[in-house]
Amino acid sequence: MKLIARLMSMCAVLFFAINSAYADDEVRIVIDEGVEGARPIAVVPFKSNGSVPADIAEIITADLRNSGKFNPIPVNQMPQQPGSASEVTPDAWASLGIDAVVVGQVTASGNGYQIAYQLVDTVGASGNAGAVLAQNSLTVQPKWIRWGAHQVSDEVFEKMTGIKGAFRTRIAYVVQRNAGSHELRIADYDGFNQFVVTRSSQPIMSPAWSPDGQRLAYVSFENRKSQLVVHNLGSGQRKVVAAFRGHNGAPAFSPDGSRLAFANNQDGLLNIYVMNSNGGHPTKLTGGAGNNTEPSWTQDGRILFTSDRSGSPQVYSMSSSGGGATLIGGGRSYSGQMSSDGKTLVMISGDNVVKYDTTTGTSEVLSSTFLDESPSISPNGIMIIYSSTQGLGKVLQLVSADGRFKARLPGSDGQVKFPAWSPYLTK
């Protein structure tokens, strides 16, 4: 079966390290394709009264660009560099096709920094050119200054699009280091502020976030046996919740965090099971011919999964209590994830990331990279992160859901795979 061959290939990668090297310890975004045709916007360099540990405007610019919705203009093309709304000359920007400008200041405040911004209407869409569309002021500790910039991005993005921003989110991923160890890491969505959650001499696979962002479930091969671990990120406590006979893999939290869906082959074929997220007796949901794996939950509580029951892997949907399954991803498809609004299914098809519109039934190929795997959608459905093969290594890739913006996150000291996008976070 093709699905079995694919799973065996993935396991082979886990146990045999491929020699590759990356210069940096952290992943960093490298732009592959810009945002031609996206909405122009300007983020003016923020005024400051001294040294600031991060360029606030640069972070906001990158966030808006990464969404694929905006095309921020370069600083050297700006007709002026105002620090406040009162200094903005609307006509100077409107003549360039810029209908909104972000201006602001960063000032030292006690042991932290105060970030203040204003979003200015330059064309009178609000009824008054020069009007302030949104503004805020926040004080952050030095270590949270990038988080503060992401908050500004979230507020600007939501005001301009009506969609909640997802720049204050993180990604979990696995790094198989060149030295042979395996690390589960977390970083801000753009690759900054990386830290190691756990490391092991044995493989780690398939991290999955709880809906509150407080826990990660993942597959560990400690004791050379696959088992599911739930890791509390606040306390650091780790609990093995599944060490059943056979392979235990592909954990996924239910929308309320109370249950885990996972795959197990204790009966010979892979099937989908559900159990309490703290462990307990599992309930088998699938059966019959074929392998069933890679469960993921929709917001309304259904389970998507990959099955080769028809001869090749395809994405199906079923109730969380089991029963009949409905084919929703035609052709050769796997690793399905539904957007939170239920309108978009993202999956791998033909070894590339594909977006499927559940309303119209139309599909769009979003990636052009090689051997794509493990797509994960941002909580607002605007961006997708996945892993792909580059040369002899695995790297992370970022693509906007409209396909306009594409980037790599290659900077690491080993193979980077199994990315998982967090839910909305507070910090």
Curated annotation (Swiss-Prot):
It is found in: Periplasm. InterPro entries: 6-blade_b-propeller_TolB-like, PD40, Tol-Pal_TolB, TolB_N. GO terms for biological process: cell division; protein import. GO terms for cellular component: periplasmic space. The keyword Signal applies. It comes from the Bacteria. Keywords: Cell cycle, Cell division, Periplasm, Signal. Its main location: periplasm. The keyword Cell division applies. Residues 1-23 form the signal peptide. Pfam families: PD40, TolB_N. Part of the Tol-Pal system, which plays a role in outer membrane invagination during cell division and is important for maintaining outer membrane integrity. Belongs to the TolB family. NCBIfam families: propeller_TolB. The Tol-Pal system is composed of five core proteins: the inner membrane proteins TolA, TolQ and TolR, the periplasmic protein TolB and the outer membrane protein Pal. They form a network linking the inner and outer membranes and the peptidoglycan layer. This is Tol-Pal system protein TolB.
